[in-house]
């Protein structure tokens, strides 16, 4: 799909801010579209509610654009949206150590690695623009156990996007 007409439609105010869009699918005649970008503070219930509503509005607007303007989508229908909006980042643990983007790019292998990561560093702007900073990781990097251990609390381990990482490293480990 040629994305340039979509970018031009966004510039004319006919489409909301979007990323990509990226398309994929595993079944004949069914595609998924990853495109919606909504900003806000996901620790604030009002912002989160707004993001849920706005995200669905934007998904419908993008679907209608595809249906009306892209060959092959003329008889399509929107089957579903995600059950909840995806949250890229909120709070992160202050751990015994912090995995950094520099360590990711250097393919560091800490002595206490508990997993390997190799996903590209994908950081979205926080101001609502559609761009991304994507950097491919040349080699797998280690995720240290100490990044899961809080610096000041005993008997607790973190997992997922809340482990102790800087913003750039979060773009790959999340």
Tell what function each PLM region has.
Residues 167-174:
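A conserved FAD-binding loop/helix module that cradles the flavin
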Residues 1-159, 163-166:
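Mobile, glycine/GP-rich and aromatic-enriched active-site lid/loop segments adjacent to catalytic centers
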């Amino acid at each position: 799909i040629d994305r340039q007409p979509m970018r031009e439609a966004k510039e004319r105010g006919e489409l909301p801010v979007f990323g990509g869009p990226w398309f994929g699918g595993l079944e004949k005649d069914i595609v998924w579209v990853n495109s919606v970008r909504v900003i806000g503070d996901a620790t604030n219930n009002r912002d989160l509610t707004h993001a849920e509503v706005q995200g669905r509005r934007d998904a419908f607007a993008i679907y209608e654009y595809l249906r009306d303007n892209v060959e092959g989508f003329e008889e399509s229908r929107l089957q579903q949206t995600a059950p909840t909006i995806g949250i890229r980042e909120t709070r992160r643990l202050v751990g015994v150590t912090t995995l950094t983007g520099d360590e990711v790019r250097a393919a560091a292998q800490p002595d206490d690695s508990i997993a390997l990561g190799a996903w590209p560093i994908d950081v979205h702007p926080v101001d609502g623009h559609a761009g991304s900073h994507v950097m491919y990781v040349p080699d797998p990097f280690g995720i240290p156990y100490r990044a899961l251990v809080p610096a000041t609390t005993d008997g607790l381990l973190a997992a997922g996007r809340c482990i102790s990482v800087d913003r750039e490293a979060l773009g790959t480990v999340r």
